[in-house]
Amino acid sequence: MGKITFYEDRGFQGRCYECSSDCPNLQTYFSRCNSIRVDSGCWMLYERPNYQGHQYFLRRGDYPDYQQWMGFSDSIRSCRLIPHTGSHRMRLYEKEDHKGVMMELSEDCSCIQDRFHLSEVRSLHVLEGCWVLYEMPNYRGRQYLLRPQEYRRYHDWGAVDAKAGSLRRVVDLY
């Protein structure tokens, strides 16, 4: 069970809304989000309703203003509780439709270019666990939640291009 609290103002002030499950539309509960407290679980937040737009991965902790979660604005319109699993495994492909060179991964990877000599990933197959793909090395840039399924093209995980810099397993460390 997860628990996240959204606050309209910085520093955990103003109107707040507590959530414990996926919510495709948070607009009815608050108009802006400037701080967040994650009491339990790992969460993916989305800039727009129905799990669209920029994505922000948060684990347990306090985020006193939106820059703390690398937000571009105070707009959070949907959220998803990420299920915890024990093992993680995925396959990266250099070409669409799971073609070309394939690399398998079961641990975090801070730099895909250094490890696999790839700057772009055109398709993925997440076999176990949930992952966050970052467009830049060292877990920076745009973030994309990857759940167990096949992603035949980078559009399938919500990206605008095939840039892939780093990958991190979703693990609740507490």
From Swiss-Prot:
GO aspect biological process, one term: eye development
Gene Ontology MF annotations: structural constituent of eye lens
S-methylcysteine: residues carrying this PTM: 23
Region: Connecting peptide, residue numbers: 84-87
SUPFAM superfamilies recorded: gamma-Crystallin-like
GO CC terms, sorted: cytoplasm; nucleus
Positions of the Beta/gamma crystallin 'Greek key' domain: 2-40, 41-83, 88-128, 129-171
Pfam families the record matches: Crystall
Keyword entries, A-Z: Eye lens protein, Methylation, Repeat
Additional notes on this entry: There are six different gamma crystallins identified in rat lens.
Role, per record: Crystallins are the dominant structural components of the vertebrate eye lens.
PANTHER family: BETA/GAMMA CRYSTALLIN (PTHR11818), GAMMA-CRYSTALLIN C (PTHR11818:SF32)
Family from the record: Belongs to the beta/gamma-crystallin family.
Notes concerning its domains: Has a two-domain beta-structure, folded into four very similar Greek key motifs.
Protein name, UniProt field: Gamma-crystallin C
Organism placement in taxonomy: Eukaryota, Metazoa, Chordata, Craniata, Vertebrata
